[in-house]
Amino acid sequence: MKVKASVKPICQKCKVVKRKGVVRVICQDPRHKQRQG
């Protein structure tokens, strides 16, 4: 899980999702997981 100020999709399968007011990127590749913070 990477914590970044600006989250961006890295590949085609990355999805930007908002959960409980937190912007996240979910992907099949676990290295692409990101959270805004």
Swiss-Prot record:
Give the Pfam families listed for this entry: Ribosomal_L36 (PF00444)
Q: What are the protein's UniProt keywords?
A: Ribonucleoprotein, Ribosomal protein
InterPro entries named among the record's database cross-references: Ribosomal_bL36, Ribosomal_bL36_sp
Q: Which GO terms describe its biological process?
A: translation
Kindly list the residue ranges recorded as spanning the membrane.
none
GO cellular component, as recorded: cytoplasm; ribonucleoprotein complex; ribosome
Q: Return one GO MF term.
A: structural constituent of ribosome
Protein family per UniProt: Belongs to the bacterial ribosomal protein bL36 family.
Q: What is the designated name of this protein? A: Large ribosomal subunit protein bL36
